[in-house]
Amino acid sequence: MGDYAVGKTCIIRRYVSDSFSEDYKASIGVDITSQQLQFELHEVQLQIWDMSGQTDFRQVRTQFMSGTDCAILVFDLTRPSSLENISSWINEIYATTPNIPLVLVGNKADLINERKVDSEAVKRIVEEFRMFFYIETSAKSGSNVTPLFQDVAQKLMSDISPD
């Protein structure tokens, strides 16, 4: 989840089909995809929900959040307002699924010269909301996209008790 145009759909497309498009098309509602990955000796199926970042779709988003195992929150490293809005996204998530594990993703890491987000502000949010972890990605180059989803799967699997 996150503001519009932060790269949520691009991250998912990069992970699922190893593709990237420069053309921005706003997501409408919710798009669901799944991806299998090998985790230790287990095959894990991730069901990934791409939810529109536009306020018009808030009610749709909340209908789909129940039963979610983890929320990935994405902001744009070149747009400080998208980081500032993360707490609003967390409040929306917690209204439906309190205490869900959260992951914070700073996207567009390839735009090094355009970066405007302060790393201390990121650190404060990670600590305040006790995020699973924070990672910077580039959907355009593919940097850290696969590790993002692998790390989510690993954290979720390690939290499952063996009984």
Q: Can you describe what each PLM-predicted range is?
A:
Residues M1-D163:
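TRAFAC-class small GTPase G-domain
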